[in-house]
Amino acid sequence: MALTKAEMSEYLFDKLGLSKRDAKELVELFFEEIRRALENGEQVKLSGFGNFDLRDKNQRPGRNPKTGEDIPITARRVVTFRPGQKLKSRVENASPKEN
């Protein structure tokens, strides 16, 4: 099961008493600000949670798994996430949920 933006909005509605519209807008604005910062080449640091960084990957050789043909994998920029120590610790100490 995954946490969705809709569930985050619902949580803000329940816990903070925001209207459903305001809660949804708050979640959208939060993620839009992260997107904007990354698009502008900025690092995003969320204290107690982790860091979003941009990494440039060089072109490298690859292979088509169906045909075995050599094909180049083009250079690209990727987003990486490094969890902070507090998040790592909480995840490591959490009891696993039964599926």
Curated annotation (Swiss-Prot):
**Per UniProt, what is one Pfam family of this protein?**
Bac_DNA_binding
GO CC field: cytosol
> Which GO BP terms sit in this record?
DNA recombination; positive regulation of metabolic process; regulation of DNA-templated transcription; regulation of translation
Q: Does the keyword Transcription apply?
A: yes
The record ties this protein, via CDD domains, to: IHF_A
UniProt KW Mitochondrion keyword? no
Q: Which GO terms describe its molecular function?
A: DNA binding; structural constituent of chromatin
Look up the domain of life of the source.
Answer: Bacteria
**What keywords appear on the UniProt entry?**
DNA recombination, DNA-binding, Transcription, Transcription regulation, Translation regulation
The record's region (Disordered) falls at 49-70
Note the PANTHER family from the entry. Answer: DNA-BINDING PROTEIN HU, INTEGRATION HOST FACTOR SUBUNIT ALPHA
Physiological role: This protein is one of the two subunits of integration host factor, a specific DNA-binding protein that functions in genetic recombination as well as in transcriptional and translational control.
Q: Which HAMAP family match?
A: IHF_alpha
Q: Say which family it is in.
A: Belongs to the bacterial histone-like protein family.
Q: How does it assemble?
A: Heterodimer of an alpha and a beta chain.
Name of the molecule in the record? Integration host factor subunit alpha
The species this protein was found in = Cronobacter sakazakii (strain ATCC BAA-894)
Q: Which gene encodes it?
A: ihfA
